[in-house]
Swiss-Prot record:
Catalysed reactions, semicolon-separated: N-(5-phospho-beta-D-ribosyl)anthranilate + diphosphate = 5-phospho-alpha-D-ribose 1-diphosphate + anthranilate
UniProt: anthranilate 2 binding residues: R180
Cofactor(s) it depends on: Mg(2+)
Name of the protein this chain belongs to: Anthranilate phosphoribosyltransferase
Keyword Cell cycle attributed: no
Assembly: Homodimer.
Length: 354
């Protein structure tokens, strides 16, 4: 079987699971074509649970490369329901897996970003490391997520923000669900969501809980020509966090540059993670409403910072990274304080339920 990838390349037909697993067990890297072949078999429903689990564990134990993850992403896109949203778009998302059970910072940030006038196409799913996932909270806020791909695009045009529910746009991932659940461990699959937005956005802010995977994610985005900020809190959060210092991988013009970041450098205090702790979807939705109504505190500060990260990815402006983030924090704060962010959510609710 040939695997036709989105960039037009074909993989070599004569491959086998032993031909991939044995090199991985010897610590040898695979090519993008080889991992694309494996993912194509998985997403076609032609791989057994044992083959899926063996591949996922062997790849993670060996340590993924940019080429290997790129191959997985290409195959996922080949099986995805992709969409085209006109104009410049941005996404903000975390990989999950930090086990911190925080409120939905990236989801609230997406609404704030839309309030600044940027067009947001968020890609998300049920809970990974938050107490509830982005989709759970958005449904509690009144956003209708049960939309066809065409309606998802229409909502983006009408409201300036839309949501791609992963299970609807990547239905072939169901073939890996049983093996992933039975493994119960973090594998490469956990970082593929942020790399496979169905709208193929070109600007992203991506939080990565796994320190080893953050530069890999940045490398994949760089190879695609995306503009992005990839980050990880030094305490393990998949956010540009206010609970600690962070590492940031700035992706621009095909180049990745790693920088340290301290929230105190933009005037934000370091707070305990308990200040960002969430609960169920109803609680987290209420936190979002209070944020949009102008409530001050640690949640607002974290949302402003992460909103700023996405705005920098979309349009960095001038100066150092710290200066860029400081400038965008002011833009995000104005979106909340003027009521524009709350209006963006109201437009989203109305458009998605029309």
């Amino acid at each position: 079987m040939n695997v036709v990838t989105p960039n037009g390349g074909d993989s070599v037909a004569a491959r086998s699971w032993p031909g991939l697993l044995n090199p991985l067990l010897r610590g040898e890297d695979l090519s993008a074509e080889e991992t694309a072949w494996a993912m194509d078999r998985i997403m076609s429903g032609e791989a057994t649970d044992a083959q899926i689990a063996g591949f996922a564990v062997a790849l993670r134990a060996k340590g993924e490369t940019v080429d290997e993850v790129t191959g997985l992403v290409r195959a996922m896109y080949a099986h995805a329901n992709t969409i085209e949203v006109p104009g410049r778009t941005v996404d903000i998302v975390g990989t999950g897996g930090d086990l911190a059970k925080t409120v939905n910072i990236s989801t609230m940030s997406a609404i704030v970003i839309a309030g600044t006038g940027a067009k947001v196409v968020k890609h998300g799913n049920r809970a990974a490391s938050s107490a509830s996932g982005s989709s759970d909270v958005l449904e509690k806020l009144g956003v209708n997520l049960e939309l066809t791909p065409r309606r998802v695009v229409e909502v983006a045009e009408a409201a300036g923000i839309t949501f791609c529910f992963a299970v609807k746009f990547h239905p072939a991932l169901r073939y890996a669900a049983k093996a992933r659940k039975e493994l119960g461990a973090q594998t490469t699959f956990n970082i593929l969501g942020p790399l496979t937005n169905p709208a193929q956005v070109r600007s992203q802010a991506v939080g990565v809980a796994d320190a080893r995977m953050a530069p890999i994610v940045a490398g994949v985005l760089a190879d695609r020509g995306n503009s992005a900020l990839v980050f990880r809190g030094d305490d393990g959060l998949d956010e540009l966090t206010t609970t600690a210092t962070s590492r940031v991988w700035v992706v621009r013009d095909g180049v990745v540059r790693e920088e340290p970041f301290d929230p105190r450098d933009v005037g934000l205090p370091i707070v305990p993670v308990e200040a960002l702790r969430g609960a169920d979807a109803s609680y987290n939705a209420d936190v979002a409403r209070r944020l949009l109504d102008g409530e001050a505190g640690a949640v607002r500060e974290a949302v402003l910072l992460n909103s700023a990260a996405a705005l920098v990815a979309l349009d960095p402006g001038t100066g150092t990274l710290t200066e860029q983030l400081a400038a965008k924090i002011l833009v995000a704060a104005e979106a909340i304080d003027s009521g524009a962010a709350k209006q963006a959510l109201e437009r989203w609710i109305a458009a998605s339920n029309a």
